[in-house]
A protein has these predicted regions:
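Hydrophobic alpha-helical bundle signature of multipass membrane enzymes
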Residues: 2, 10-20, 24, 28, ...
Length: 561
C-alpha cells in the first residue's frame, strides 16, 4: 500500500487573509521619505535637525512595529481540533504519557494524567510543578506552549489537521513504514536496489526500492537519498568541518523486550547505551541519519547548508557568490555590498530566529492540542494485543501488517525497535519538532539563495561510508537539495522510530507557515531597492512576499499590506 502524501491535505492559513491595507497617515514609504519630519524649525537648523531626525525615526519605528503587529493580530486562532483519541479512551492509552507514573503495561495513572491536563489548562508554573513523575527524566518544556513571540504570527494562530487515530486504517501505512525502517536501518542507501529486505518493504508499501522511505518532492525523489548539504565539507570560519561522524555499530537497537520497554515509558533512564564504531563515516544508511538528528543542535543542518552556499562563491560574503538570490538588491550594485542586510550576518541570524518561532508553534500543537502518543508507545499496544497480554483497539490492518510480523521474526516481539537507548524525548509526537524547524529554515534558505542554480558537483557515500563517490549523472539544484535536506532531517527522526510520517509532514508544513509569517514582518524593514522574497513551497506553490509584507501565492490573491 502506497504511503499517502498528506501534504496536499494539510490546509494552512493563507497568509494575510485577514490583513487589511494599512490606512492612516503612516505607510512604509512615508517612514523613510521624510513625510514624518514635520517638526517646526523654530531654532537653528544645526541644533534642531538631530532632534527632528531622532523624533521622526522613533515614531517611524513605532508605527512600523504597530502596523506589523496589527496585521498579525488579525490572524484567526488555531482550531484546536485533535483526533479525539484522548476522550475516546478514558484510560488515556492513545495519549502521550511518557515520564508519568504508569503500570507495567504502560498505562498511565489517571490522577497523574489529570494533573498534566490541569497544568496545561491553567498554564501556571506552579501547576506544572505539581505533575507527578515516576522516573529520573523530566517533561520537555510543556510551558513553552504558552510563550509569546514578537515576530511573525502568534504561535497559537497556526493550524494543522488532526493526526490519524490509533483505531483508524490511516494509522496502518505509516506505522508499518516505521517497522520496515527498523528492519532496514543498516542497509546502505547505495544498496537499496539489490537488498531483499528493502525490496520486500517497498513492495508492501506500494513503492519502489529507489523511492521507498523518501519524501514527496522532486528533490527528494531524484539522486542520492542524502542531501549534498549533509555530505560536503562546511567552512565554519577558519575551520572546515568534515561531515563524517561517529556512528552506532549495526544492529544496535533498543526496547525490543517488555522488560526494557516498560521502565523507559515511566521516564526511567535506559540501563544500556549504544556501542559506537571507532571509524567516522558519512551518513550512509537510516541508522546513521537517525544518529545525526539525535545530537544535532536545532538548526545545525541548515546553518551548515547556508555556510556551504555562502562560501561557494569568489568571496565568503553572501551577496558576492553565485548562489545569492535574484532578489538581493546588492547583486548588481557597483558601490555597495550587503552584510548586515542581505548578507552573511542576516541569513545566519534568521535561521535561529525562525527556529525559535517554529518550536513555539510546534509545542503549542504538541502539548495543548494533540498530545499524540509516540510510536514506541503504540508499539507496546501492538505487542501486548498480538501477544494476548492485553487487548487494545488497534485497527486490524495494523495487527495483521506484514512488517509487524517481520519484526517478530527477527526480535521475537512485536515492539517497535528503537535506535536510541532512551527512545523518544518527553514531549508528544505531533507535529515533529525537527520537521517544523526544517520547514521554517527551508523558507529562509530559499528566500536568501537562488533555488534554480545548479550545485557544482554531486556526491554520495560509499556503501561503507568511508568515502564519497562522485555522481556525474546527476546535477541537483539548490532548491531541490534544500527540499531534500528538510525531509532528511524530518525523516531521520522517523528512522529512529520516534516519529510517524504524518508528524513530519505536518511539521514541515507548519514550519513553512511560521517561516513565511516571520519574513512578512522582516520584509517591511528595508530601505534598499528591494522587490521582495520569492521561492517555492514543498508543494511547488510559488510564493512572493512583497516589501509591504503582502504574500502572493501562485493561483491566489494578494494578501496583507
Amino acid at each position: 500500500m502506497e504511503i499517502p502524501d498528506n501534504s496536499d491535505q494539510l490546509s494552512s492559513f493563507e497568509f494575510g487573509k485577514a490583513f487589511p491595507l494599512m490606512s492612516g497617515s503612516f505607510s512604509r514609504r512615508t517612514f523613510f521619505a521624510g513625510a514624518l519630519v514635520a517638526t517646526p524649525l523654530a531654532r537653528c537648523l544645526n541644533a534642531i535637525i538631530p532632534e527632528v531626525i531622532k523624533e521622526s525615526r522613533t515614531q517611524a519605528a513605532f508605527e512600523l512595529r504597530k502596523q506589523t503587529a496589527l496585521a498579525q493580530s488579525k490572524r484567526p486562532m488555531a482550531s484546536m481540533t485533535s483526533n479525539g483519541d484522548e476522550n475516546s479512551f478514558p484510560n488515556r492509552i492513545a495519549c502521550f504519557a511518557k515520564g508519568l507514573p504508569q503500570n507495567r503495561f504502560g498505562e498511565v495513572e489517571p490522577a497523574a494524567y489529570n494533573a498534566l491536563l490541569a497544568a496545561i489548562k491553567s498554564g501556571k508554573h506552579a501547576d506544572f510543578e505539581r505533575i507527578p513523575r515516576s522516573g529520573g527524566r523530566k517533561l520537555n518544556n510543556p510551558q513553552a506552549a504558552y510563550t509569546f513571540h514578537l515576530e511573525g504570527g502568534d504561535p497559537h494562530t497556526f493550524d494543522i489537521p488532526p493526526a490519524p487515530s490509533i483505531t483508524s486504517e490511516a494509522a496502518q501505512p505509516e506505522t508499518s513504514e516505521l517497522y520496515w525502517q527498523a528492519l532496514c536501518r543498516d542497509v546502505p542507501f547505495l544498496s537499496y536496489e539489490t537488498s531483499p529486505i528493502v525490496r520486500q518493504a517497498a513492495r508492501n508499501l506500494g513503492a519502489t526500492p529507489s523511492s521507498v522511505f523518501r519524501g514527496p518532492t522532486k528533490g527528494d525523489l531524484a539522486g542520492p537519498y542524502i542531501s549534498q548539504f549533509l555530505l560536503k565539507p562546511v567552512r565554519y570560519g577558519a575551520y572546515t568541518i568534515d561531515q563524517r561522524y561517529s556512528m552506532p555499530v549495526p544492529g544496535t537497537d533498543f526496547m525490543t523486550t517488555l522488560n526494557e520497554w516498560s521502565p523507559i515509558q515511566s521516564g526511567i533512564p535506559p540501563w544500556r547505551e549504544a556501542s559506537y564504531d571507532l571509524m567516522p563515516r558519512y551518513i550512509r544508511n537510516g541508522r546513521d541519519l537517525a544518529e545525526y538528528v539525535h545530537y544535532d543542535f536545532p538548526y545545525q543542518a541548515f546553518l551548515g547548508a547556508a555556510l556551504i552556499l555562502i562560501n561557494s562563491g569568489p568571496r565568503s560574503i553572501l551577496n558576492c557568490n553565485q548562489f545569492r538570490s535574484g532578489s538581493n538588491p546588492y547583486r548588481y550594485s557597483t558601490v555597495e555590498e550587503g552584510f548586515v542586510t542581505f548578507g552573511q550576518a542576516e541569513v545566519t541570524d534568521w535561521l535561529g530566529r525562525v527556529t525559535t518561532a517554529a518550536l513555539k508553534a510546534a509545542y503549542y500543537q504538541k502539548w495543548m492540542v494533540h498530545r499524540r502518543l509516540r510510536p514506541e508507545a503504540l508499539g507496546g499496544l501492538i505487542h501486548q494485543t498480538k501477544a494476548s497480554i492485553r487487548k487494545y483497539p488497534i485497527h486490524s490492518s495494523l495487527l495483521e501488517s506484514e512488517a509487524v510480523d517481520a519484526i517478530f521474526h527477527r526480535y521475537s516481539s512485536y515492539l517497535l525497535p528503537q535506535a536510541y537507548p532512551e527512545g523518544c524525548p518527553l514531549h508528544p509526537s505531533y507535529p515533529a519538532g525537527h520537521a517544523t524547524i526544517a520547514g521554517a529554515c527551508s523558507v529562509v534558505l530559499k528566500a536568501c539563495f537562488d533555488s534554480s542554480m545548479l550545485l557544482p558537483s554531486c556526491v554520495e557515500p560509499s556503501a561503507d561510508g568511508l568515502t564519497l563517490v562522485v555522481r556525474s549523472d546527476y546535477s541537483p539544484t539548490v532548491g531541490d537539495e534544500i527540499d531534500k535536506l528538510a525531509f532528511n532531517i524530518a525523516m531521520g527522526r522517523d528512522w529512529a522510530g520516534i516519529h510517524y510520517r504524518s508528524d513530519s509532514v505536518a511539521g514541515l508544513r507548519l514550519g513553512e507557515d511560521v517561516g513565511i509569517s516571520v519574513l512578512q514582518d522582516l520584509a517591511c524593514t528595508y530601505t534598499e531597492d528591494f522587490k521582495g522574497f520569492s521561492f517555492k513551497r514543498f508543494s511547488g506553490t510559488e510564493v512572493h512576499i512583497t516589501p509591504q509584507g503582502e504574500v502572493v501565492q501562485s493561483g491566489g490573491p494578494r494578501h496583507r499590506a
